[in-house]
Amino acid sequence: MILKHGKRAGAALSGVLIAIGLAAAPRPALAQGSKCIDEAASIRRAESQLPRLEVAPPGDQQIVCITLETNILFARRMSAHLAQCPRSPHARNGDTWQRTGSQYTAQFAERRCKPAIRGYRG
């Protein structure tokens, strides 16, 4: 009888130790989720501040080129974000930004723009 209770206590203790070990283990999925949430919020803010091409004066080559380049870099950032965070709230706009980025890249080349923005390169 004592052996029987000893085995139960040992099994219970083992279960508790396993549960503690699992609770203390690092959780990369949660960390990744937090990074994705933070980046999604940052992207939302950045998107609201993007310069619009239709507002740029068409005759001002420098402003048009910088506007195009800014939006191209944003499209790359969005693409990189969606590659890391496919369940992002921005996923539904991913295809639109990919097309927009391609169109702006073509316009950037047609206008013979030169890259002027340093820093983020996606």
Spans of features found by a protein language model:
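Post-signal/leader-peptide non-cytosolic segments of secretory proteins
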Residues: Q32-G122
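Residues within alpha-helical transmembrane segments of multi-pass membrane proteins, especially transporters
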Residues: G21-A23
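Cleavable N-terminal signal peptides
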Residues: I18-A19, A29
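Bacterial N-terminal signal peptides that target proteins for export
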Residues: I2-V16
